Amino acid sequence: MTSLPWDRWQNGWLEAVADSDISSLWCFGSMRMFLEHAQEFAATRWKMSQDVVWEKHNGSSFHADRVRRVHEHVLHFYRGPWSKVWKQPQTTPDAVAKTARRKARPPHMGDIGGGEFTSYDGGPRLLRSVVRMRSMHGRARHPTEKPIGLLAPLIRYVAAPGETIIDPFCGSGSALEAALLTGHRAIGIESHEPYAEIAALRLSQNIFLNDNYSGDAS
């Protein structure tokens, strides 16, 4: 947390979300934030299933005696039995088919001769836990705005087509736009009126093609 007015942990939001029928939750933040509030997640029965690291093209460092921070954590939490939680594993189209040659083994290791085989694993592969994608630096409408290309696969993973996603801190509306682009409905909550107006204007423009969405996660 910093001294910035919008950089605050809002007490009670985990309880409010837990009171709904929501079973999946993606949460962005620093490791420090998650450690400081671990008991609050546990008290509201949110269990962590996995973590994603968003590696940005640039970073920031508030301290000269620490490493330069170029990443952000994205943790997935769920409630209830894991078997009943909707999940649609996401893929990226960057697997590469390859041909490998096997060398003949020396006699003392057994009689396995040389050979050649081709693996046909080109095409889609599971989304990696480290996602490299440019931040919105220089283009952002909100200090913590996320790229659509990062949010879209996270939404598709936790919500079936046509379902409603809720962003209780929607900022300029990136998650809401990503939800619409992926065939979902969306509800956003934003306490800062200027950002709420930006989000409303953004969604009213009915953007179906977005330059940010073209950035593939890799």
Indicate residue ranges for each PLM-predicted region:
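Short, exposed beta-strand "edge-strand" segments with a Pro/Gly-rich flavor and a Y/T-containing core
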Residues: 1-7, 84, 144
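Class I S-adenosyl-L-methionine
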Residues: 45-218
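Conserved Class I SAM-dependent methyltransferase catalytic core
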Residues: 3-58
